[in-house]
Amino acid sequence: MKDQIYMELLKKLKDIVEPICEKYSYELVDLEYRREPHGWVLRVYIDKVGGVTVEDCAYISEKISKELDIKDPIPHSYILEVSSPGLDRPLKRKRDFERHIGEKVNITLLEEIEGKKKVEGKIFKVDEKNVTLKVDDSLMVIPIEKIKKALLIVEF
């Protein structure tokens, strides 16, 4: 029951936050709402073409905060944090993978594919249902629904 209530709250929060992000040309990448040692935290991860600055985070935080104060979906005090997803950001949706074609990624699978549960390679192609990775000298097709976790590999 608690999971259902949590998921409903996340959906409400997304329904409030996402239109604000879109209005100001940001993409809502992810939302987290969790209890931490210092209290409840609502984390909003945003992105935009060219990357996100500290000023962007402050600007959109103010807009989101005003709307959350009006709609008041959270019944107790919390801290709002707005940030970019970082260099080693998780990839979750088709568009996340599309944005990073040609970049290295580390993927953990829900079940083995071709005898592997973890795969590292470059994103070669993305379609509606699959991500194709170039692993060494061969291509590996991975259904997006079979991906447990995907992280960009930062190369310097």
UniProtKB/Swiss-Prot annotation:
Subcellular location: Cytoplasm
Keyword Cytoplasm attached: yes
Domain of life: Bacteria
Alphabetical UniProt keywords: Cytoplasm, Ribosome biogenesis
GO terms under cellular component: cytosol
GO biological process: ribosomal small subunit assembly; translation
Pfam families: DUF150_C (PF17384), RimP_N (PF02576)
Family: Belongs to the RimP family.
Role this protein plays: Required for maturation of 30S ribosomal subunits.
Protein name: Ribosome maturation factor RimP
UniProt organism field: Dictyoglomus turgidum (strain DSM 6724 / Z-1310)
Recorded name of the encoding gene: rimP
